[in-house]
């Protein structure tokens, strides 16, 4: 029988796990951030933990970048998964709250991707906005600028300040992983036992995937240069470090999703902190840059509201055997129906001098295939 203290602490642990992604609802908040009234602006936001609320009040000038990051993360997730059974439906556009995707809190592959992409997106938006001068506390990274003239190129201009962006992401995004300290009785035994280890393991894996996403961002920095010299001889180049389009980062994290490592969390005697290890010890150990997960993903075929799974009924599919959204795969063997839609479009357009464009109305037949 669990004691009342254990029940309360287990409840707190579960709440902290559920809150780990709720801040993504920031992207749909309608209000703007008033720098003169940080308390009012932050209190009106949904989904923030207490630590994130404190961050908001102290760093109101960065919150627009954080919100842009949540939007970018959601958009990129939907792009990468729009043809799959789980299409990254995360936020309810009516309530502006994160849909309770329970499976995301079970440390699945999908959870790993969402944590990594959201962490990277916040760092990305803060970094780019710093270069635009949105905050007096950050700007370009001039640390690499070289004025010695010894090399064939010189770092000059505005390099993206990735270190600052990563620091903000780590402080804001990682703070959602609230930790409840291990509580022990007089004999040194954990009051929560396996529940504590399980919750600690979930937090550790979420933090690992957050960091993996930021590593992808940092490694994506590329050097851009401009040539100087007579007749384009490029005798001297001035260079700066710049981040690519966020789509490039999203694709890199998606590749890591495809190769994610299945792990488990173990607590060894004499070592206070649990460790993340490969579930199958015969496989090569994961690295800090790999995405990791503990729970195999559901098949997402049937609707399961209690777990936040929408199912694939009514989803549009294609008749392409090798495609991810092929009807036989997306519809989970339930079959599909064909719907024909006639739409009117403009065609045979001609330019009439002067200055008019005349078109003829045309009907176009569109066939759609929907999962049963």
Curated annotation (Swiss-Prot):
<dbReference type="GO" id="GO:0045165">
    <property type="term" value="P:cell fate commitment"/>
</dbReference>
<feature type="disulfide bond">
    <location>
        <begin position="77"/>
        <end position="88"/>
    </location>
</feature>
<feature type="disulfide bond">
    <location>
        <begin position="354"/>
        <end position="355"/>
    </location>
</feature>
<dbReference type="GO" id="GO:0030182">
    <property type="term" value="P:neuron differentiation"/>
</dbReference>
<dbReference type="GO" id="GO:0060070">
    <property type="term" value="P:canonical Wnt signaling pathway"/>
</dbReference>
<feature type="lipid moiety-binding region" description="O-palmitoleoyl serine; by mom-1">
    <location>
        <position position="231"/>
    </location>
</feature>
<dbReference type="InterPro" id="IPR018161">
    <property type="entry name" value="Wnt_CS"/>
</dbReference>
<feature type="glycosylation site" description="N-linked (GlcNAc...) asparagine">
    <location>
        <position position="87"/>
    </location>
</feature>
<dbReference type="GO" id="GO:0005886">
    <property type="term" value="C:plasma membrane"/>
</dbReference>
<keyword id="KW-0217">Developmental protein</keyword>
<dbReference type="GO" id="GO:0005109">
    <property type="term" value="F:frizzled binding"/>
</dbReference>
<dbReference type="GO" id="GO:0097402">
    <property type="term" value="P:neuroblast migration"/>
</dbReference>
<dbReference type="GO" id="GO:0001708">
    <property type="term" value="P:cell fate specification"/>
</dbReference>
<protein>
    <recommendedName>
        <fullName>Protein Wnt-1</fullName>
    </recommendedName>
</protein>
<dbReference type="GO" id="GO:0001764">
    <property type="term" value="P:neuron migration"/>
</dbReference>
<dbReference type="Pfam" id="PF00110">
    <property type="entry name" value="wnt"/>
</dbReference>
<dbReference type="InterPro" id="IPR043158">
    <property type="entry name" value="Wnt_C"/>
</dbReference>
<feature type="disulfide bond">
    <location>
        <begin position="347"/>
        <end position="362"/>
    </location>
</feature>
<dbReference type="GO" id="GO:0005615">
    <property type="term" value="C:extracellular space"/>
</dbReference>
<keyword id="KW-0325">Glycoprotein</keyword>
<dbReference type="GO" id="GO:0030971">
    <property type="term" value="F:receptor tyrosine kinase binding"/>
</dbReference>
<keyword id="KW-0449">Lipoprotein</keyword>
<comment type="similarity">
    <text>Belongs to the Wnt family.</text>
</comment>
<keyword id="KW-0732">Signal</keyword>
<keyword id="KW-0963">Cytoplasm</keyword>
<dbReference type="GO" id="GO:1905491">
    <property type="term" value="P:positive regulation of sensory neuron axon guidance"/>
</dbReference>
<keyword id="KW-0272">Extracellular matrix</keyword>
<feature type="disulfide bond">
    <location>
        <begin position="225"/>
        <end position="239"/>
    </location>
</feature>
<comment type="function">
    <text>Ligand for members of the frizzled family of seven transmembrane receptors. Probable developmental protein. May be a signaling molecule which affects the development of discrete regions of tissues. Is likely to signal over only few cell diameters. Binds receptor tyrosine kinase cam-1. Together with Wnt ligand cwn-2, regulates the migration of CAN, ALM, BDU and HSN neurons during embryogenesis, the migration of QL and QR neuroblast descendants during larval development, and polarity of ALM neurons. Also acts with the Wnt ligand egl-20 to direct HSN neuron migration.</text>
</comment>
<keyword id="KW-0964">Secreted</keyword>
<dbReference type="GO" id="GO:0010468">
    <property type="term" value="P:regulation of gene expression"/>
</dbReference>
<dbReference type="GO" id="GO:1905485">
    <property type="term" value="P:positive regulation of motor neuron migration"/>
</dbReference>
<keyword id="KW-1015">Disulfide bond</keyword>
<feature type="disulfide bond">
    <location>
        <begin position="227"/>
        <end position="234"/>
    </location>
</feature>
<feature type="signal peptide">
    <location>
        <begin position="1"/>
        <end position="29"/>
    </location>
</feature>
<dbReference type="GO" id="GO:0016055">
    <property type="term" value="P:Wnt signaling pathway"/>
</dbReference>
<dbReference type="GO" id="GO:0048018">
    <property type="term" value="F:receptor ligand activity"/>
</dbReference>
<dbReference type="GO" id="GO:0040028">
    <property type="term" value="P:regulation of vulval development"/>
</dbReference>
<feature type="disulfide bond">
    <location>
        <begin position="140"/>
        <end position="158"/>
    </location>
</feature>
<dbReference type="GO" id="GO:0005737">
    <property type="term" value="C:cytoplasm"/>
</dbReference>
<keyword id="KW-0472">Membrane</keyword>
<dbReference type="GO" id="GO:1904936">
    <property type="term" value="P:interneuron migration"/>
</dbReference>
């Amino acid at each position: 029988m669990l004691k009342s203290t254990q029940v309360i602490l287990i409840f707190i642990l579960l709440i902290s796990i559920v809150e780990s992604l709720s801040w993504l609802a920031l992207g749909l908040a309608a209000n703007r951030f008033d720098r003169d009234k940080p308390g009012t602006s932050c209190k009106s936001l949904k989904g923030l933990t207490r630590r994130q609320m404190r961050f908001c009040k102290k760093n109101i000038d960065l919150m627009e970048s954080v919100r842009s990051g949540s939007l970018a993360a959601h958009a990129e997730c939907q792009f990468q998964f729009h043809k799959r059974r789980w299409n990254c439906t995360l936020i309810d556009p009516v309530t502006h709250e994160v849909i309770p995707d329970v499976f995301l809190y079970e440390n699945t592959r999908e959870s790993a991707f969402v944590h990594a992409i959201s962490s990277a997106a916040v760092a990305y938006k803060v970094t780019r906005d710093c270069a635009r001068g949105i905050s007096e506390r950050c700007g370009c990274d001039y640390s690499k600028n070289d004025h010695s003239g010894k090399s064939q190129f010189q770092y000059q201009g505005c390099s993206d300040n990735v270190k600052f962006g990563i620091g903000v992401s780590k402080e804001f995004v990682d703070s959602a992983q609230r930790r409840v300290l291990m509580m022990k009785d007089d004999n040194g035994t954990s009051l929560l036992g396996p529940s504590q280890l399980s919750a600690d393991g979930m937090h550790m894996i979420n933090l690992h995937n957050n960091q993996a996403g930021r590593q992808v961002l940092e490694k994506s920095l590329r050097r851009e240069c401009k040539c100087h010299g007579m007749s384009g001889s490029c005798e001297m180049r001035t260079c700066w470090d710049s981040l690519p389009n966020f789509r490039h980062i999203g694709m890199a994290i998606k590749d890591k999703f495809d190769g994610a490592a299945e792990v488990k969390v173990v607590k060894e005697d004499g070592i206070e902190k649990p460790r993340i290890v490969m579930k199958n010890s015969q496989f090569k150990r994961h690295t800090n840059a790999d995405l990791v997960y503990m729970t195999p993903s559901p098949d997402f075929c049937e609707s399961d509201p209690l777990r936040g799974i929408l199912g694939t009924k009514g989803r549009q599919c294609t008749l392409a055997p090798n495609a991810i959204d092929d009807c036989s795969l997306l519809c989970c063997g339930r079959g599909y129906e064909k719907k024909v839609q006639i739409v009117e479009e403009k065609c045979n357009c001609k330019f009439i001098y002067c200055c008019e464009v005349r078109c003829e109305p045309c009907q176009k037949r569109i066939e759609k295939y929907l999962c049963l």
